[in-house]
């Protein structure tokens, strides 16, 4: 025997209206949001408790409000032992049952109130892992949370332009980034923290015409928009790290801000970055960094025998950098519990 029913989960600006699925004889599926029966979380956010609704079999949809007000529907058919997406009209979304045994034998004539009914666990994944989890009656999470373990890629690009016309830099970098979902608001976006081990060789023509190279290691933090368009997402990232060098003076501290376009289909990003930042150092002569980086340089000056006075000089090197990343993103599922 197979059943279909309507499940409605409305998520707007971090607030979700949804509940566990409860079968009751003669009345189709009863949707309850009472905490003692079920809790609905969206990536750790506890959803609002809706009033009780009784829905009839045969209807079949999930409604999600993305970015606060835009409603999208995902057509779903629930059968015994299966959970099938019929019409995935929600952009880059999939709905799947993670515990197929949880929705069998729900219709019990001796339990008309459904007190001993198990709950169907389902997950909505929208773009950057928008996750809806329904817990069982004991409050246990009977689902598999998606966790992005590792992203491997090779970045090849360069920074061109800037106020120092002699500094046209070409960089080659390789990165290994271990990414995990820190927090997520399905309506507004996702926050990721990436530990980025970056080996970067920059070829730099300075004012003297000499070729310079340096190696850079850094730590990257990125904020990724959760609502993409056909698999594409936009990421605003900030990079913070120190640099070691060969052939040029060593920047002590540096930051970057970038804007990237990413395709989330187990393929590493193809990204365009607008780079700017600040590097501080203690050298008193010569450009202390490369194009694409704003330099705030401190130098010690002696004046009239009164000792050393700190003088700040600011050099601006701004430009665009095009990075092409080719790699593979490994997605795995972390089982967080069973009823």
Swiss-Prot record:
InterPro entries: PEGA. It comes from the Bacteria. Pfam families: PEGA. This is Uncharacterized protein TP_0923. It comes from Treponema pallidum (strain Nichols). The lineage of its organism: Bacteria, Pseudomonadati, Spirochaetota, Spirochaetia, Spirochaetales.
